[in-house]
Amino acid sequence: MKAETPYIHLHQRKRTWTPVQVSAGQLLDGGEEVIQRALALRCLEIPVGDFITDAMKGDLPDVKGCKELLASNVVDEEKHDIALNFAATAHGVSPRFEKEAAHICKTWLELDRHPVLKAVVLERSVFF
């Protein structure tokens, strides 16, 4: 059955999931730095949720399901944060990479762009 709106369609496609603690897997030689740098960027998950929340305060399409989908995305960002923190704890992350990621996060927070643009760019470039 076809969903009433594209927003409802996207929301219906989402799967329920719960973050769980993990143990460190074995990484290929040379992959440790890549994984640690990626895990350090977990500090951007909550800001992405905040960008979405900020966007919900402004003009949104008056289409059924839009706000509900965005609200569910904020919850997803919180779950991503928990899951990535579990992975970071399991693998460990260099303080140097944490510092680099904090600088990147600060730069994004200070960027004077629409919150949806910031959320979309981060989701597409960092988390996918």
Give the residues covered by each predicted segment:
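Non-heme di-metal
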Residues: 1-128
